[in-house]
A protein has these predicted regions:
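Residues lining hydrophobic/aromatic ligand-binding pockets adjacent to catalytic sites
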Residues: 15-208
Length: 208
């Protein structure tokens, strides 16, 4: 039956690798970072493959993160690059959305896309990559909670992947935190959605 996420998961806080099977997916946002700082963060976390989940893999204000420029910089650092448009954002919400817990229409649209066969296929492809090497998924936002990669992280969690979010200061060593499931998410098996939350009534006021 349905259950709140905190009753389902004991979120693993450490990423482990057993043999050639990697149990952890990483996430990162490029923001306005210099390319050398960004690549340093990937190297600090042992990333061998960067999966770009931007819908449009270029940046007018940060040209170092255009697809061709980024792929060349990663190649020089012996890190592979792959663009997965099938996991990109900018999805439209449905009129009959079951994800009304998201007031942000962009996040709701992506959550609606997560209900489709296309997303399920793309997620399986991503998880297969994670079994081969250390993978980080990348989008543009500096922090995951402002980015659709946080929803991808949720989907990975319900599919028994540990997910760590990498945070990168403009100077200094990167650090990472375990990704935790969105608080209002609901889960049934590997199905994930974000229903509208009940509105609590305001406390009554005694009028003299």
């Amino acid at each position: 039956m349905f259950a709140w996420h905190e009753n389902i998961f004991a979120i693993r806080t450490v990423c482990l690798a057993i043999g050639s099977i990697h149990l952890c997916m990483l996430t990162i946002g490029h923001s306005t970072l210099p390319i050398d700082i960004f690549i340093q963060a990937l190297q600090e976390n042992g990333v061998a493959l960067l999966v770009d989940v931007r819908t449009i893999p270029r940046s007018r204000h940060n040209p170092q993160f255009g697809m061709e420029e980024l792929a060349a910089s990663l190649h020089a650092a012996e890190i592979r690059y792959r663009w997965m448009q099938s996991l990109g954002g900018l999805r439209h919400s449905r009129k009959d959305s079951i994800n009304m817990g998201w007031h942000n229409t962009s996040f709701r649209g992506y959550a609606d896309y997560m209900q489709t066969d296309a997303f399920a296929t793309a997620l399986k492809e991503l998880m297969a990559l994670d079994e081969e090497t250390t993978v980080a998924i990348m989008c543009s936002e500096a922090v995951p909670w402002r980015c659709h990669r946080s929803l991808i992280g949720d989907a990975l969690l319900v599919n028994e992947h540990t997910v760590d979010d990498i945070f990168v200061p403009t100077a200094g060593k990167s650090h990472r935190k375990p990704h935790t499931l969105t608080t209002f998410a609901r889960v049934q098996g590997t199905r994930l959605w974000y229903p509208e939350q009940p509105t609590l009534p305001l406390p009554s006021r005694n009028v003299p």
